[in-house]
UniProtKB/Swiss-Prot annotation:
It holds the Pfam family DUF2179. Gene3D superfamilies: 3.30.70.120. GO terms for cellular component: plasma membrane. This is UPF0750 membrane protein YitT. It is found in: Cell membrane. The keyword Flavoprotein does not apply. It comes from Bacillus subtilis (strain 168). Keywords: Cell membrane, Membrane, Transmembrane, Transmembrane helix.
Length: 280
């Protein structure tokens, strides 16, 4: 348990460092915006810098924006998930204060692509190990509890506002480069983790009862079991079908590996659910 928590903490630190590096060394110096709350923080920092007699850094604004979201997550999502998410935001803010805002390239396209890739690697790793970078991920969790509709619309609306505002503030060329960054970020996160809110896991195993008990001890999810037989070995097994959110994927993978390392698990995207799906 201590080893797992230490590993998770280390991943959160590395993810925050990569996210901060992508912002300070590539995106912010080039006036190219990230997605989600980070992009909102960049926009607010630009507006304050242009129209106010004082300056507030992107990192500070990112932390302030996540305070109400963190409180919401604590009440509606779960304490462990929220603590790691806020820790990720705090570390990102810290690293953004330490790393200099200096451009490694004068080519805006290179900044947009590499900034998006480096930040996305940090975000993807954080998600893969059961945490998040706060902001929209916590909002998405809350929305997923209220309704089973895809939350991609909310991501699209907020990122669309970021692109339009970037165009008004910095010119439409910068807005197009921001669009490149958003595309690259999404593709890299997809490659490392997944952007799908709900997933279906099909687990073929000889230890269905043990896995079932372990799953029920960690999460509240319904499981359907179907008799299965290996075509080559003719061995009798069971296939367990369970629908989870993407934030539970890390816990599920960990359970299956611990109980039955020889189990075969297939994870597929779930586009819709009809019937009861527990949201608590």
């Amino acid at each position: 348990m201590v080893l797992d928590q230490t590993k998770k903490l280390l991943i959160v630190i590395i993810g925050a460092l990569l996210n901060a590096a992508g912002l300070n060394l590539f995106l912010i110096p080039a006036d190219v915006y990230a997605s989600g709350f980070t992009g909102v923080a960049q926009l607010l920092s630009s507006v304050v810098d242009q129209y106010a007699p004082f300056y507030i850094s992107t990192g500070t604004l990112l932390f302030l924006l996540n305070i109400p979201v963190g409180i919401l997550g604590w009440l509606k999502v779960g304490k462990s998930f929220t603590v790691y998410s806020i820790l990720s935001v705090a570390l990102t803010t810290l690293f953004m204060g330490i790393l200099p805002e200096t451009s490694l390239s004068h080519d805006i396209l290179l900044n947009a692509v590499f900034g998006g890739v480096i930040s996305a690697v940090g975000i993807g790793l954080t998600l893969k190990y059961g945490a998040s970078t706060g902001g929209l991920d916590i909002v998405a969790m809350v929305l997923a509890k209220w309704k089973d509709k895809p939350v991609g619309t909310y991501f699209f609306i907020l990122n669309g506002i970021i692109i339009l505002t970037a165009g008004l503030l910095q010119g439409w060329e910068k807005a197009l480069y921001t669009l490149v960054t958003l595309y690259v970020t999404t593709r890299v996160i997809d490659a490392i983790h997944t952007r799908h809110m709900k997933l279906t896991a099909m687990i073929v195993t000889k230890k269905a009862d043990e896995i079932k008990e372990a799953i029920y001890g960690k999460m509240v999810r319904g499981i359907t079991t179907v008799p299965a037989k290996g075509a080559f070995t003719n061995e009798q097994k069971e296939m367990m079908i369970i629908v989870i959110t993407r934030y539970e994927l890390y816990d599920l993978e960990k359970i299956v590996k611990e109980v039955d390392p020889k189990a075969f698990t297939n994870i597929v995207q779930t586009t819709g659910i009809f019937g009861f799906f527990r949201k608590d």
